[in-house]
Amino acid sequence: MAIKKRSATVVHGASGAAAAVKNPQASKSSFWGELPQHVMSGISRMVPTLIMGGVILAFSQLIAYSWLKIPADIGIMDALNSGKFSGFDLSLLKFAWLSQSFGGVLFGFAIPMFAAFVANSIGGKLAFPAGFIGGLMSTQPTQLLNFDPSTMQWATSSPVPSTFIGALIISIVAGYLVKWMNQKIQLPDFLLAFKTTFLLPILSAIFVMLAMYYVITPFGGWINGGIRTVLTAAGEKGALMYAMGIAAATAIDLGGPINKAAGFVAFSFTTDHVLPVTARSIAIVIPPIGLGLATIIDRRLTGKRLFNAQLYPQGKTAMFLAFMGISEGAIPFALESPITAIPSYMVGAIVGSTAAVWLGAVQWFPESAIWAWPLVTNLGVYMAGIALGAIITALMVVFLRLMMFRKGKLLIESL
């Protein structure tokens, strides 16, 4: 019979009463065990905001730059003021401007939503406002107050936003702080409303303000600024290294937390017009297309079926979902045989994404698959990168499965 470790030891005092003594090691393990769940809670609530903002933003660009043929170096507002549009085209352009503005606002709420729900998952609904405020300050930090000795005057300056790094740190800290304060601050029943609607919100807001201003924004901004400086200074080599890293992080867990973190990094660079989102968008679709393709070519290449019966229809489904920008269709393959699937689609995603970036494919619009393809610069090269990555993925997984089958390490259920 398995005996589970207890998180507390019962000690009997002189009076015979039992007292629970916390085990620090168990509490530490519990913290690290629960933390990924809290982070995923924030990510799952943030994704709809990202999708809404991204799709509406992409739609505005589709109207302006594909349908109305506005030159890529001209903004929508400049096009409105050019006097070249009238009637229905002018109405379309106005709608494109509205979609761009609204989509940008929605997109800007993604990180605050993430931070709010991470804090909420940790500290309950009382921690939600603190998390939201912290997430908002990570994208729109408070101005820095500086004294200029030359003019003997105070002036303000804009710090580098801490973005995802800052939101992650402040949401966790604020969540546990509110949870601790709620447990430790004991008031009479008639003051509970005062505690939950005034005292805890004010204390947590002051903490977030001070922590973000003096610690988290400088730290996160320093990291973000350093990364951008290095990538910009490295030029083409930096862009290729960035593409490889983003592609690997995007593909590795097929929509999981690492993928979402890579999305935050990529989108922050894209919205600030530092680096395009090309590599991430390509890496999203390569794994499901490649694994789906493997179920089609395995018998033609090897003379035998190398996948279990249920994976063949799932391969076709994965390919279809890939064109919708959904990589989760590849998950059954990764679960069934991670040793063959994960290395294959990782290599395919890295090679295909990097090749497309190196050959000049550019995508600035924060969406993937068919939703953004009409807005890609050098679409032919972009699609060639997807094809290259998918073919590499398919060939690798077929070859690895064949090797394992011949060694007797792969059991295949026949159709």
Curated annotation (Swiss-Prot):
GO cellular component: plasma membrane
Keywords: Cell inner membrane, Cell membrane, Membrane, Phosphoprotein, Phosphotransferase system, Sugar transport, Transferase, Transmembrane, Transmembrane helix, Transport
Bilayer topology term: Multi-pass membrane protein
Transmembrane found in the keyword field: yes
GO molecular function terms noted in the UniProt entry: protein-N(PI)-phosphohistidine-sugar phosphotransferase activity; protein-phosphocysteine-sugar phosphotransferase activity
Subcellular location field: Cell inner membrane
Coiled coil feature spans: none
Membrane-spanning parts: 47-67, 102-122, 127-147, 158-178, 198-218, 238-258, 277-297, 319-339, 342-362, 379-399
Annotated domain remarks: The EIIC domain forms the PTS system translocation channel and contains the specific substrate-binding site.
Record's function text: The phosphoenolpyruvate-dependent sugar phosphotransferase system (PTS), a major carbohydrate active -transport system, catalyzes the phosphorylation of incoming sugar substrates concomitant with their translocation across the cell membrane.
The protein, known as: Fructose-like permease IIC component
Lineage, top ranks: Bacteria, Pseudomonadati, Pseudomonadota, Gammaproteobacteria, Enterobacterales
